[in-house]
Structures are given as structure tokens and as C-alpha cells.
């Protein structure tokens, strides 16, 4: 169990509803991006790892600006190994984001989401009762744009359990803390980067397996190219460092790499 937390840790670059949202007219992978009222957007991402290049994951987030402050989105992810020798439908989620402040370059967003995973595990059934977990998340982000540089920090709490509404059970709790940067080089090119820590607040996970402050640091850097204000393409690399017990940190083998495409209309 704890599938969603583990999958989002292992493929954090593909995380459904990472707590990033910007009120820029252009879609450009700025961590503060938010669609204007009446605008749709799509973010498509593919990723792999240098130590497992026969395995690929893909994610899609499709959203809509209900107002200039409120946006809704659905997201899903899938993965495959050895040219679809094995594959599964990982996650499906629904999220809301609300901008509570936009003043003097400062922006504050509140987010909430609900997700399930795996939706269709390999050799399993749809929403498999023995494998599928359900995740509720709330979060906040604070960011500021200073000329060509945007900086943003976020915090989020996740609650994962074996059913959607069995909140009386212990479940599995995680916290995510992170920071992102976006540097505009010119009208077309931009550099992006970010770090995030994902850790559990529990000493036991599903099945009563004991853990001690288990968590993962991930870091990413990338470059984006804007075709116009309504579309961009980007490439990135990332590395993770994790621990299973206090004081026992190790850098994960290999590095993540992938590409991203965004469009609004």
C-alpha cells in the first residue's frame, strides 16, 4: 500500500497536481502559471531514468480557468516497460486552485486535490481493492515575480488510505516542501529549476511496516522554449536522494530525464 505516495516519490517529476500554479498571460512553465478566465490549458509530460531507459511514464494535466482566480484541472498518468511488455494506468486526479492574493508581484495560491492510484494496475483490475490507494491533498504556494526572475515556495499535506472516506483509520500522511525558480532569458528561452522534499509524518505505513522519517529530496533543472505566448516545449533532468531511516541518506541511482509540452487556448 501507500502506492500513490511511493509512485509520486519515484516519479516526482510526473506528480499529479504538484503545488504549482502564475497569473501570466502566457503559458511557459512558470511556477505561478494560472489560466485566465475562459481559457483551457494542457500540460503533457514524458519521463524516464538513465538506469531504466526501457521504462517510460507519461502524464497529462488538462485545466480550465473558471475565473481569473479559480482554476480546475484533471490529471492522469500511465507507464510502460520494455515496449509495453508491462504497463499500467497509474493515477487519476481532480484538483482546484484559488489565487487569494495578487499584489505588487506577490501571489498566493491555495490548492486541493483528490486522486487514486493505481487506476488499472498491471495484471490487476480497475480500482483494485487490494492495490488502489486514495489520496486527499491540500497545499499553499507563495511566489513573487521580480523582473525576469520568478521565485515560489510551496507546502502541501497528503492523506492516503485504502478507501476514499475511511478517515477514522490511521492512513498514511506525507508532507511536501519545495521551492521553484523561473528565469526568462529572452522572448523565447527560459531556465527552470526546483527542489522538493517529500516525507512521511508516520512511523508506520500500510501493513504496519515500521519507517523512521522516510523521505526523498528531488532536484530538477531544465530549459524551455516558447513558440508563442500560447505554447512551449521544455526538457529537464533530475536527481533524487532518499532515506529509509533517520541518518541513512543515499543518492538514488541514475537521473531522471524528460520533456514537457504546454498549450493554452
Summary of predicted features, one role per range:
Residues 60, 94-96, 138-140, 177-179, ...:
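Membrane-embedded beta-strands of outer-membrane beta-barrel proteins
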Residues 127-207:
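Detector for outer-membrane/organellar transmembrane beta-barrel domains
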Residues 64, 98-100, 142-146, 181-183, ...:
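Residue-level signature of outer-membrane beta-barrel architecture
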Residues 46-50, 76-82, 100, 114-120, ...:
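Transmembrane beta-strands of outer-membrane beta-barrel pores
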Residues 8-45, 49, 187, 229:
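Outer-membrane beta-barrel biogenesis signature
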Residues 93-96, 100, 225-227, 252-265:
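Outer-membrane beta-barrel "beta-signal"
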Residues 54-58, 86-92, 130-136, 161, ...:
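Residues that define the transmembrane beta-barrel architecture of outer-membrane proteins
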Residues 40-41, 68-74, 103-108, 148-153, ...:
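Repeated loop/turn-to-beta-strand initiation elements of outer-membrane beta-barrel proteins
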Amino acid at each position: 500500500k501507500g502506492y500513490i505516495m511511493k509512485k509520486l516519490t519515484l516519479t516526482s517529476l510526473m506528480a499529479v497536481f504538484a503545488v504549482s500554479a502564475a497569473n501570466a498571460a502566457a503559458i511557459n512553465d512558470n511556477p505561478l502559471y494560472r489560466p485566465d478566465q475562459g481559457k483551457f490549458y494542457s500540460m503533457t509530460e514524458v519521463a524516464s531514468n538513465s538506469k531504466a531507459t526501457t521504462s517510460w511514464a507519461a502524464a497529462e494535466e488538462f485545466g480550465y480557468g473558471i475565473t481569473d482566480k479559480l482554476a480546475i484541472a484533471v490529471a492522469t498518468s500511465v507507464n510502460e516497460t520494455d515496449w509495453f511488455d508491462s504497463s499500467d494506468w497509474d493515477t487519476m486526479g481532480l484538483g482546484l486552485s484559488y489565487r487569494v492574493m495578487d499584489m505588487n508581484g506577490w501571489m498566493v495560491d491555495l490548492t486541493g486535490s483528490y486522486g487514486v492510484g493505481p487506476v488499472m494496475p498491471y495484471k490487476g483490475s480497475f480500482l483494485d481493492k487490494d492495490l488502489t490507494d486514495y489520496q486527499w491533498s491540500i497545499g499553499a504556494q507563495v511566489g513573487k515575480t521580480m523582473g525576469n526572475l520568478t521565485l515560489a515556495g510551496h507546502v502541501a499535506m497528503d492523506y492516503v488510505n485504502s478507501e476514499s472516506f475511511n478517515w477514522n483509520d490511521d492512513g498514511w500522511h506525507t508532507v511536501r516542501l519545495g521551492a521553484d525558480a523561473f528565469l526568462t532569458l529572452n522572448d523565447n528561452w527560459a531556465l527552470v529549476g526546483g527542489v522538493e522534499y517529500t516525507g512521511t509524518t508516520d512511523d508506520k505505513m500500510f501493513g504496519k511496516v515500521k519507517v523512521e522519517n522516510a523521505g526523498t529530496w528531488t532536484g530538477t533543472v531544465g530549459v524551455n522554449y516558447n513558440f508563442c505566448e500560447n505554447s512551449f516545449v521544455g526538457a529537464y533532468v533530475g536527481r533524487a536522494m532518499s532515506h529509509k531511516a533517520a541518518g541513512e541518506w543515499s543518492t538514488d541511482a541514475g537521473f531522471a530525464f524528460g520533456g514537457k509540452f504546454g498549450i493554452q487556448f
